[in-house]
Amino acid sequence: MPDSNNKPILQLRNLRKSYRDGSGSLLEVIHLRQFELGTGDQTVLVGQSGSGKSTLLNLIAGILLPDGGEIVVNGVDPTKLSEAARDRFRAANIGYVFQSFNLLQGFTALENVLLGQMFGGGHGGADRAVELLKKVGLEHRLHHKPRALSVGEQQRVAIARALANAPPLVLADEPTGSLDTKNGAAVLGLLRQICGDGGHTLLLVTHDPQVMSSFEKVVRLEDLQ
Amino acid sequence: MNLFKIVTKNMRQRALATWLTGTSVALGVALAVAILLIKQGVQQRFEQGTLGYEMVIGAKGSPLQLVLNTVYNLDISPGNISWKLFEKLRDDKRVKLAVPFSVGDNYHGFRIVGTTDTFFKDFEFEPGRKPELAAGRIFNFKEDALKSAFQEAAERARERESKERGEEVTPAPEPAPVEHPFEAVIGSTVAEQTGLTNGEKFIAAHGVQPSAEAKEHTENPWTVVGILKPTHTAVDRAIYINLDSFYHIEGHELRSPTAAAKPEEKDNDPDPGQVSSIVVKLQSPIFAFGLYREINDREDAMAAFPAAEIRKLFDIVGNIDRLLLAQAILILVVAGVAIAVSIYNSMSERRREIAILRALGARRATIFSIVLLEAVTICVIGAAVGLVGGHLVVGAANGLLYKASGFVIPALHVQTLEWYILAVAVILGAISGLGPALGAYRTDVARNLAPSS
């Protein structure tokens, strides 16, 4: 495991995000003092349902903008970029694995991975996409559409897609949430292994104690508030 | 992977909606193209058809009817004019050529036209193009035989009128025997559709249009002596007989003069015969309006310029064309709305896909382009299919058109207007895709990425 004292990949300071609730009053979901991840770190972030874990990942990915505070990913504060530049930055620097896989149904496994490359500048081309699918054990499923894959296989495709542009930071939002225990463990092991081999920093959010227990570095969201 | 691949994947994923909306665009474009092709083709053929017919002279009535009857073998003859007028025109220094025509019979719906051998020898139905024989020869024509036929016809008319008045009919002295060869030269379409061959005999029916009650001239069958090469004009659909044989048979009597010629011509010389119309070619176009006025000053005849009459006809028909084109455009607009509705309807499932693409790094503008490109692609493919379809429909209909009218529309001819239709389809696609594309542009990524419960 790489030393967490390496160059920081993610730095969050005084991060705040609020939503208006149904009655129109502001509801603060995120108020995070400081958080940092180094190159190659593998950290699990835990918290209760509705505690703002997914919102935090969306803030880091630049999908949502914070009300205040600072986010630095790989030395860049994406909130200071234009929206288009932020999108390009996200494609090149952040891989995202979702609980519900979020594969495009009309595209094959290989095409889904190629889509991951497309917006980040086509890093490595089709060869890398095939190689990634081989790494997740799907070399025989390259041209299958998601509907023809098991849920475990679908999440493997999602992992390959998240790593398509070799991003320094991989965000995983409950990646085992839709899988059974056996599949969940296999997928988690694969994700950690590929991230570890490639030196990708992994931030995984979950409320599953079993997933938590497999990580050395566990951070509770409420401790950061 | 590129944008167009994403677009085609989207279209394939919603194949039924894509197919239906694309088909509606194709139908609208095919209809518009077919209307344009038919309109231009018919107008071109009609205008081309008038090229050899500088001026047509016939009985007073509708000039358009006279033109349709003489030039296109359509409609009925407005009446007869005197043979004397024909002779006068033939001898007029301003006239280069005068060809008489008489109509009144048909064979299987094909008009039988009585004329002289001048029609084959000197008449150019289009500049530089005379009727040419594919087989056989032209019919024999002798002017003395025609004069004799006129006498016979006048005598029959006199006998009939006496009978109608209840007077005793005194038989006319037997005319000196004159040979009236019943010979016919048939147009290429007539030969093709009736199967008549050279040397074969046929029996004509009275009237210019077929009718179950029509009297057949069984006593005088005509013999095919020549078959013309295709001209792609009304000539192909006509049977030409010598004028003397036309007046030799029962039923083709000289009509009582409807109106007198100019008073100075009235009594001096009895009218020897009649014809339905005369086609006149002038020595120079400068004589056209003088002769036109002279003829129209007469009480028994009128002159018409076929080209001018056809232009007038198409000015009227043009309004119907515009109406049909408006209908085609309406179909296109409805197709555009259908595309917009179809994409809108799929937006709920698309929003998740859009959110995924955004999470993967796609810009809002990229998402906007994908949706817009999809609508434009459907329209362009639909329009392209419609363009080809329109030409194919006209090409397929040409067989029927040829049977019905004797000419074909150049189905492969691409008109400039068709490129405008394609441009309109692109604009229509862009307009119909604009609303859904804006919706896609505004998609809330975070909300649509959340797992659906």
What are these regions (language model features)?
Chain B
Residues 106-116, 126-257:
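Hydrophobic secondary-structure segments that place a key small or acidic residue at a functional site
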Residues 17-41:
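Short, strongly hydrophobic transmembrane alpha-helices
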Residues 23, 321-342:
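Internal alpha-helical transmembrane segments of multipass membrane proteins
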Residues 36-131, 137-138, 142, 154-180, ...:
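Hydrophobic, regular-secondary-structure patches
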Residues 331-334, 344, 351-398, 427-428, ...:
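Transmembrane alpha-helical interface segments in multi-pass membrane proteins
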